[in-house]
């Protein structure tokens, strides 16, 4: 892979992610250090025997975009023809894993389809350079979750937690209109909204445009499903900004 050939074009959402979806995690980023972001990026370029590093970056007035690369060991099965018989052989191989993250001017860190290993490496690098409390968790309060649901075309499922019931602490409601079910209304007052899955209008509010299916978690983790068509990157970023604007700051990550 040549770094010069890498271009920042956002996450592609091909048909292959239709079932699993593509994730976006929103965090708060506040720097207590005077070190410029450009210097930090230069120091963390992927080189030598580094297991994680930045391979490309781009800057706009609103944000700085980065592509990073790490390596992971996975088990792969290959077939081998031996003495007229097909054998399955398990091998451990090292594979590259690319991730994308954006640092907004207003102090939001967006992780696009970022794996756990990548997130750990990024968090360590940021805290080492900008302070131990520079990255904080964002959280959606119940009213914020309700506000997002009112904007949805259709809510397909909703999960409650912290119900305080002696027999169950969590409950999930599904169906054509789960928020209007009698049981949901009875439990929602005492519990917190853990997550919901809904359809939102995609694009410029054109009714002919296929809706965007999103699962929203209260810890500001989003998962987008394209349905029959890929979800445009611009729609993903617009929705992520809407969520970050109404999120509250929580504990240090």
Map each language-model feature to its residues:
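Extracellular/luminal low-complexity segments enriched in Ser/Thr/Pro
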Residues: 111-112, 224
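C-terminal interaction module
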Residues: 162-253
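Intrinsically disordered, low-complexity polar/charged tails and linkers
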Residues: 1-107, 115-182, 238-253
């Amino acid at each position: 892979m040549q770094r010069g050939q890498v271009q920042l074009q956002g996450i592609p959402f091909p048909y292959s992610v239709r079932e699993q979806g593509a994730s976006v995690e929103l965090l708060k980023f506040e720097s207590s250090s005077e070190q410029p972001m450009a210097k930090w990026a230069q120091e963390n370029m992927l080189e030598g025997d580094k297991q994680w590093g930045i391979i490309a970056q781009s800057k706009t007035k609103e944000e700085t975009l980065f592509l990073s690369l790490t390596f992971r060991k996975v088990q792969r099965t290959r077939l081998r023809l031996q003495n007229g018989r097909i054998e399955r052989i398990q091998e451990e191989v090292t594979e590259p894993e690319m991730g994308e993250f954006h640092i907004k001017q207003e102090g939001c860190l967006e992780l696009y389809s970022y794996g756990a290993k990548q997130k750990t490496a990024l968090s360590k690098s940021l805290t080492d350079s900008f302070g131990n409390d520079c990255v904080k968790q964002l959280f959606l309060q119940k009213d914020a979750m309700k506000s997002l649901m009112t904007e949805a075309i259709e809510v397909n499922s909703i999960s409650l937690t912290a119900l305080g019931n002696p027999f169950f602490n969590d409950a999930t409601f599904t169906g054509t209109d789960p928020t209007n079910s009698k049981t949901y209304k009875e439990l929602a007052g005492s519990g917190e909204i853990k997550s919901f899955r809904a359809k939102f209008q995609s694009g410029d509010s054109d009714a002919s445009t296929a809706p965007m299916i999103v699962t929203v978690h209260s810890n500001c983790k989003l998962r987008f499903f394209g349905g029959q068509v890929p979800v445009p990157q611009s729609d993903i970023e617009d929705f992520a900004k809407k969520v970050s604007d109404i999120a509250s700051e929580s504990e240090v990550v």
